[in-house]
Each structure stands twice: as structure tokens, then as C-alpha cells.
């Protein structure tokens, strides 16, 4: 019996792997002699290869952005609400590419991959990466797919930083940049949150200096704590209050330090437990450092407008009112710099109670604004 997927789903998708044997020079001064990128595509590339859209993922994201890998999958890809027939990124119009970034832990070459020089996992020996390193690796994937110029590059959070970096590093190769819930650089507070998360991992006795795979263990406790800290910053006070309030798991207090008493405690522990079973600790360290290091305006003395002076793309910048991790003020910094540089930009600030995670939640105004912009650029 055939499985019936929703009409607006891309249906079953099969991940693909691209191998690159040309060395990739990295910002840290090291290089990778070879590497692999896992990716998925949705829709059809037109004859002129002018309808391609690149999806850049956030910290814990991956290549599986839409559709299903098997009929038995409980959930579709992480951005299925935005990718598919009739959705904002309409696969009847666009050819969509979504990849797992270099350094990831979902098939692309990363710390958990085998280092061909040693026959063991890279672990902590995997080089530190930057957003621009990812962009260079993504450009090679575009070359492999025969895509000279992207109709649009779209990303939320860390993905938005990649989209912005693309327009600066390869200005002729991007027509539109859709940057959602992002920032031109991290604030001191954001760097601090990342450092707390890293210390949770680094001080876990099971981390073993990053060589935990050799020991047959994982730093589960550290990963759990890192995820719990991060997850709090992705939500808003309003959404947490609405979802959990001060509700107890049972009808009484236990007056101890070990019981899970509040519903919000139970939720955070569940999120941490689930995350620690599927994500690599070294990848988490890499991703947070890439976030911390992102500061493209540093090359122009902190002047973002000067940094953007040479870009060719048009921009759509979106933010959410209760996002305190990357607040609307941070998005407006990008908008102001683009206007000062006399670039085409539209800005949508969306009233949403969901905090930073709002870019993943298909609220009506968000979907309408997103669709309106993508409809304007469809070939």
C-alpha cells in the first residue's frame, strides 16, 4: 500500500553525497585535503540554472530540511513548513539545495568522521571553522551542481549569517539574500552563553579532550547541559510562561534537589537528553565558535556599511519581536547598514510570542511575508 503524503510535501527524498578532493584552505591557517558534503535537493533545476535556492542551517541543523526519508518517519524535515509546493520556498518554482555543513555530524565531514591520516575519528583534531569557510565549501557544491548564481540564499539564525556572508564573499553569485532572525555579529551576552555551553562539554569527564569516541563514550552530561542552556535562549519568557507557567509534574513539592518537580524542568531535561543522543560534542564546540567569530565588519574597522558596499544582492531581513537571542535591533543594524550602502532591502518585523525559535514556526504573518518576497523573485 502506497503512503500518501500531504499535497504540499516534497514527499520522499534521498540524501546525496558530494566528495571534494581539492584541498580547502581554512581561515585558521589549516586545510582539509578532502571532504564530503551531504545534501538534499527539492524541485527541478531549470535549463538556465537560474532558479536555485540554497538553504543554510542553524547551529544544530542539517541537510534534511523538507520531506521524508521513509514512509515511517514521524516528522518531516526541520523546515518543511517553508519548503514545498505552494509554500514560501515553492518547489514548483525553485530548485532547493539544503546541506549539512562542513564540521557537522549528519554525514558531512566533521569531527566524528575518520581522519584518513590516522584511521581514527578526527575528534578535537578537526580544524576550527568559520562562517566564511562554510561559504567557500558551499560554493564548491554549487559548482558541482552547475549553479553559477543562486536565485536566493535563505537562512535563519546562524544560517542567516551564512546567507549574509555569501553576498560579501561571492557578490556576483547571489541575487537575493533572505536573512531571518540573525545578527551582524554576536553580542557579548551571546558569546557568554556559548562559552557556558562549551564549558559544560569541556569539563565533562567523558569528554576526554575531544577523543571520547576512542574511549567508547560520549560526554552526555555536558551535551545535555549545553542544550538546556541554549534552549532557554531560543524561547521567550512569554512562551515559556504560556506553555509551562509554574505547573508541577505532580501535585506536591518533594523538598529535595534531585526530583524533577516543575514541568519546565522536565521539558529541559527531555530536550537535553534527546539532543545528547544525536549530536556530536566536538561539532557543538565548532558551531558555537563559528558563531562567536562571525564579524564581517571587522575587516572595515567595524563599519558594516563599508563592508557591504560591494554587494550586488537584494535583501529581505526578518526578525521577531520576542527574540532576545537575536533581537529585532540586531536585524535593524543590518538594514541600516544596507541603506547606508544604498542597497535594496526590505524589512519585516513580525509580532510573535515564540522567541528565537519563531523562525521555525509557521505563523500566518511570517508565512505571508516570506511568501510575498519569494514570489517576487520566482523565475
Curated annotation (Swiss-Prot):
GO molecular function, one term: homoserine O-succinyltransferase activity
Gene3D superfamilies, per database record: 1.10.1740.110, alpha/beta hydrolase
Annotated positions binding substrate: 227, 357
GO biological process, one term: methionine biosynthetic process
A cellular-component GO term for this protein: cytoplasm
Primary location: cytoplasm
Cross-referenced SUPFAM superfamilies: alpha/beta-Hydrolases (SSF53474)
Highest taxon in the source lineage: Bacteria
Active site feature: 157, 323, 356
Domain AB hydrolase-1 residues, every copy: 51-360
Complexes and interactors: Homodimer.
Free-text function comment from the UniProt entry: Transfers a succinyl group from succinyl-CoA to L-homoserine, forming succinyl-L-homoserine.
HAMAP family cross-referenced by the UniProt entry: MetX_acyltransf
UniProt-listed NCBIfam families: homoserO_Ac_trn (TIGR01392), PRK00175.1 (NF001209)
Protein family: Belongs to the AB hydrolase superfamily. MetX family.
The name this protein goes by in its record: Homoserine O-succinyltransferase
Annotated organism of origin: Pseudomonas putida (strain ATCC 700007 / DSM 6899 / JCM 31910 / BCRC 17059 / LMG 24140 / F1)
Lineage, highest ranks first: Bacteria, Pseudomonadati, Pseudomonadota, Gammaproteobacteria, Pseudomonadales
Gene: metXS
Amino acid at each position: 500500500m502506497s503512503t500518501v503524503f500531504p499535497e504540499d510535501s516534497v514527499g520522499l527524498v534521498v540524501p546525496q553525497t558530494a566528495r571534494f578532493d581539492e584541498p580547502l584552505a581554512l581561515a585558521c591557517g589549516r586545510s582539509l585535503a578532502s571532504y564530503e558534503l551531504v545534501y538534499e535537493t527539492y524541485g527541478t533545476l531549470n535549463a538556465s540554472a537560474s532558479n536555485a535556492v540554497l538553504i543554510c542551517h542553524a547551529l544544530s541543523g542539517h541537510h534534511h530540511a523538507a520531506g521524508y526519508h521513509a514512509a515511517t518517519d514521524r516528522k518531516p524535515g526541520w523546515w518543511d513548513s517553508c519548503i514545498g509546493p505552494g509554500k514560501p520556498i515553492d518547489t514548483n518554482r525553485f530548485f532547493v539545495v539544503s546541506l549539512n555543513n562542513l564540521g557537522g555530524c549528519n554525514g558531512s565531514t566533521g569531527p566524528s568522521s575518520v581522519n584518513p591520516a590516522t584511521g581514527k575519528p578526527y575528534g578535537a583534531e578537526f580544524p576550527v571553522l568559520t562562517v566564511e569557510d562554510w561559504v567557500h565549501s558551499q560554493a564548491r557544491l554549487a559548482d558541482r551542481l552547475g549553479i553559477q548564481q543562486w536565485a536566493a540564499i535563505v537562512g535563519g539564525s546562524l544560517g542567516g549569517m551564512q546567507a549574509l556572508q555569501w553576498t560579501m564573499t561571492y557578490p556576483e553569485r547571489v541575487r537575493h539574500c533572505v536573512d531571518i532572525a540573525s545578527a551582524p555579529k554576536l553580542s557579548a551576552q551571546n558569546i557568554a552563553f556559548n562559552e557556558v555551553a562549551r564549558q559544560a562539554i569541556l569539563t565533562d569527564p567523558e569528554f576526554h579532550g575531544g577523543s571520547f569516541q576512542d574511549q567508547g563514550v560520549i560526554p552526555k552530561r555536558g551535551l545535555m547541559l549545553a542544550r538546556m542552556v541554549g534552549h532557554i535562549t531560543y524561547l521567550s519568557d512569554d512562551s515559556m510562561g504560556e506553555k509551562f507557567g509554574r505547573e508541577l509534574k505532580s501535585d506536591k513539592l518533594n523538598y529535595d534537589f534531585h526530583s524533577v518537580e516543575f514541568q519546565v524542568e522536565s521539558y529541559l531535561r527531555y530536550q537535553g537528553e534527546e539532543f545528547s543522543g544525536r549530536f556530536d560534542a566536538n561539532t557543538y564546540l565548532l558551531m558555537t565558535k563559528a558563531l562567536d567569530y562571525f564579524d564581517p565588519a571587522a575587516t572595515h574597522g567595524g563599519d558594516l556599511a563599508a563592508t557591504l558596499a560591494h554587494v550586488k544582492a537584494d535583501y529581505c531581513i526578518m526578525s521577531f519581536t520576542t527574540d532576545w537571542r537575536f533581537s529585532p535591533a540586531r536585524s535593524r543594524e543590518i538594514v541600516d547598514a544596507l541603506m547606508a550602502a544604498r542597497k535594496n532591502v526590505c524589512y519585516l518585523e513580525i509580532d510573535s510570542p515564540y522567541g528565537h525559535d519563531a523562525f521555525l514556526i509557521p505563523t500566518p504573518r511570517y508565512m505571508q511575508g516570506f511568501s510575498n518576497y519569494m514570489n517576487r523573485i520566482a523565475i
